[in-house]
């Protein structure tokens, strides 16, 4: 007698090592724009930069991705009770790479030097040039595509990255970088009421803040990078090379004195040639549950096989 059973698993197959298909395109594509913005709580024009980038992302939702790093003299906590120290060593190192000269808001687009837009001869640009630089990057061909997915079990992130080289890199070694960000961190922001009021969540200035700033939604906030600022070396960069790597990262309870909200973690993966970002992608994390409900069984299933391929 045939028994019909259907298993409903609230569990992603990849967490048990079953892989049905790749997550990266093997067709030649143009670059995505990875925008790294230097910002700070006490940068009064930074909310204007946030609003500008929000609009650009809305117009290019699958092609433009933003990472905001808090550093410099404007990135200090004005709350006597603490809880808003968004600065970190990775942000400080990143500032050394993009070279904003202390100007905020500023941003780097794919870490390219746009000589007509550059603030100090490096990759950082003032906000009046961001849209133009992003538009140029989106029209450039990429020799590598990047796919990423991130699963969260408890406070442990499992990050799966695939890359495919549709053409050979001019460099024999490339680098894979993984940024971890947190959305929806509520805290003070100078200039929010003037330049990005839609991100204000308080009806009046917060008297606990030293300058009576409003409570503001801090989005895309860089908290760490897997393998640090230098990334993970890729030594097979010729046409047809397929990269498949999985990383685990344990999220702490706090970064500095800022609580971690596990439901608001994002992950970006991008590949550089040692300086410029060639391509990348950004995703929200997917929570992984372990509840199993048995409804019915149809027939025995085969064994799942997981392969870790890189060639």
Each language-model region and where it sits:
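Long, low-complexity ectodomains and other extracytoplasmic segments of secretory-pathway proteins
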Residues: 287-305
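Short, solvent-exposed loop/linker segments at the N-terminal edge
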Residues: 150-156, 300-310
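Short, conserved sequence motifs used for protein processing/export or organelle targeting and
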Residues: 51, 62-291
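Local sequence-structure signature of Cys/Sec-based thiol-disulfide redox active-site neighborhoods
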Residues: 24-72
